[in-house]
């Protein structure tokens, strides 16, 4: 560029120069095209040479799409739609929670300009105005993008201050509109624009916001809810927005954006998606589909079976209800708790089991095989509309064709390819042959048992409940709480139980949170940075405290992942928990690059170091171990998680041994509402008013609830036939012997006085005074409100 008036040439503005998202050669940061050639991907894709862009400022040649796994090429991020980065990021399977190293660097290269502009709120607003119209990928789920949009062009946002929903953030700026691809099979009105940026759907009312430290939020305008998608850039590049449940709601999503729960039987799909009311749906499920097993797809985790329930009492066949002292009384107490929480009629859809029960051979719990003709459900549907079997085991050789879903319910025939994506328009003959090779019908929990789980009882990780307003909730027997899962059944078939895996990440006004029964905020995630985000550590190197240095640190090639992936091919233990070992390798590599002592960082965060016993070093090959250069023999344990994060991890990993840390405290709120709501007899506004009144009366206290899974060292809870808890259950205190002496008087002068034990009163009015520890102002107000 020639000089003007003797002045030096002006550098290109941020995000407009050569390279994806910023000027090339700034600091030690590699350009967007400098993706390591030897990067290893768990998807099994190889790396190829990166194409080069045409030199020149603002002029870029459209590169042809490369094969899956090709490294991203250089080019402006506005050219992302025609670049190989889009093809690379569209190969992420639904089951995978984290991105590979190659996909991680592609995300960082595309989001480079936004990261470098993330210094102040004013700089972010200028960036959104300068790069308006640019498409940026959200990583997970694939097919979703952020279209950079100035706030003045966002319809309906107005002067909304997002800091009211997150007061601890210094600033939060809305920068983009969330859009997604539309499948022509699900929405025929799209036509030829299905593969064009103009054919993207922007009707969800979702906006992307960025905060200080590159905290990423998704703002739901319709519900006035702020959702925390990522706490820093490292988490955003690694996981994307895949944990945001709201993204999966739009009914214009097609078969491949993203893949949903597989329902091979069209009759069952029509029953679930086209039921006008919960009463008719419950009647149809009990009559025809009771005991049918569905392979439930949740983004970011493996398939897991969900057994459709015909009656509430069927839960007595699953743990933890089967091992309770009185399963019928416990189920009555849980049903009473659901009535109190939902404040309306509801329907139990099914029990979600761990993934190890998926695809087991049909037969009772002892491992024997029963003939399929013994099922009454199959006999009823012998006319050609039999209920579907399980959709297939993970890794099974049987190919099960996924079916279209959503509001439109198209008729495209799809088969899964090697990357677990749906290919629209496949051969109908092959799909019919795959459907004919499906497993036999499995009914009930006994049909789930096989040789791998012989002699055991399935454990219900979640009980899926549908209220009469159409919303889907999940009752968790692990901690006894009710969590919102989806806004409707079609949303549930796309998002699965993701709402219970990412708890405490939605911030909404009190009335909105009470209406949707949102859980409490996880303050650890909202107010504190991640302990392993070492690039934000205050004792990190000086070069890592400015944006260019941080980006170069995050996108540097080789963070210890190649060694772990090599060992995973030889050791089954590492292969089973490869994500944990990859995370440990990244932490060790990051600490070494930043000059931090990982053991000190872990202990400051509340964790500890586990020292493995190894042989004494002998010889030159072990000199590095003696000098402490390698820390493979000392693996740090993570600091203790919050109760919500711990529960989410247990549900994601099917940890059947997880137990809550404590029981509800003595000051917990005891709901005295005994109303039984008839299904289909309540109005929407009345239900919302009941939930809001109970939230006001509770005053933020913990809810006293049945605990099917009691903490360690506690006795199981006991209930009456009406579901009323008897005193003395699920407590960590020793048993009361009946001997009582005042503590301020010496026992030598005052003899022990025998006091009779507490007698439970079946009368609701007398039960109010059975234990003064539970009588608070909110309890009394609730009692008079519902019993006046």
UniProtKB/Swiss-Prot annotation:
UniProt-recorded name of the protein: Protein TRS1
Quaternary structure annotation from Swiss-Prot or TrEMBL: Interacts with host EIF2AK2/PKR; this interaction retains EIF2AK2 to the host nucleus and prevents its activation. Interaction (via N-terminus) with host BECN1; this interaction inhibits host autophagy. Interacts with the viral DNA polymerase accessory subunit UL44. Interacts with host HSPA5.
One cellular component (GO) term of this entry: host cell nucleus
Upper lineage: Viruses, Duplodnaviria, Heunggongvirae, Peploviricota, Herviviricetes
Function text: Inhibits the establishment of the antiviral state in the infected cell. Prevents the phosphorylation of the host eukaryotic translation initiation factor eIF-2alpha/EIF2S1 and thus the shutoff of viral and cellular protein synthesis by directly interacting with EIF2AK2/PKR. Prevents stress granule formation in response to eIF-2alpha/EIF2S1 phosphorylation, thereby rescuing viral replication and protein synthesis. Also inhibits host autophagy by interacting with host Beclin-1/BECN1.
Spans traversing the lipid bilayer: none
The record's note on its domains: The N-terminus binds RNA. The C-terminus is required to bind and antagonize host EIF2AK2/PKR.
Encoding gene, per UniProt annotation: TRS1
GO BP terms, alphabetized: symbiont-mediated suppression of host autophagy; symbiont-mediated suppression of host innate immune response; symbiont-mediated suppression of host PKR/eIFalpha signaling; symbiont-mediated suppression of host type I interferon-mediated signaling pathway
